[in-house]
Swiss-Prot record:
One of its GO terms (cellular component) is cytosol. This is Putative pre-16S rRNA nuclease. It is found in: Cytoplasm. GO terms for biological process: rRNA 5'-end processing. PANTHER family: POLYNUCLEOTIDYL TRANSFERASE, RIBONUCLEASE H-LIKE SUPERFAMILY PROTEIN. NCBIfam families: RNAse_H_YqgF (TIGR00250). Belongs to the YqgF nuclease family. Keywords: Cytoplasm, Hydrolase, Nuclease, Ribosome biogenesis. The keyword Nuclease applies.
Length: 137
């Protein structure tokens, strides 16, 4: 039976979101959430979780290219812990190195420079995080 998974691309001003099913291994971008210094509107996240009823959540883990942690790493881990605490769903962290670069390249390829809107980049980054998580399973 297919499991629904939600993924998040954590950021201090915007949090990308994507949904996917493990049976297909593909993800679809959802609208991004605005955040204030990394704090989202939890009611908006709750609404998406209620709508999609995921079995687990995946949060992108920002790391330096050499695999070491960066300042945003701890904040992403804290966000993952809060998701788990608020919604009582299993949360996994997924290495997100280069997802933003890949997302920008994908958007640029589709629509050129004008298409590079931040919320689209965050949603596609969340898709790439989820798809890489599926591949690692």
């Amino acid at each position: 039976m297919a499991r629904t998974i939600l993924a998040f691309d954590f950021g201090t001003y915007s949090i990308g979101c994507a949904v996917g099913q493990d049976i297909t291994g593909t993800a679809q971008g959802l609208p991004s959430f605005k955040a204030q210094d990394g704090i989202p509107n939890w009611d908006q996240i709750e609404k998406v979780i209620k709508e999609w009823q995921p079995e687990r959540l995946v949060v992108g883990l920002p790391l330096n290219m050499d695999g070491t942690e960066q300042p945003l790493t701890q904040r992403a881990k804290k966000f993952a812990n809060r998701l788990n605490g608020r919604f009582n769903l299993p949360v996994e962290l997924q290495d997100e190195r280069l997802t933003t670069v890949s997302a920008k390249a994908e958007i640029f390829e589709r629509g050129g420079y004008k298409a590079l809107k931040k919320d689209k980049v965050d949603s596609i980054s969340a898709c790439l995080i989820l798809e890489s998580w599926f591949e690692a399973q």
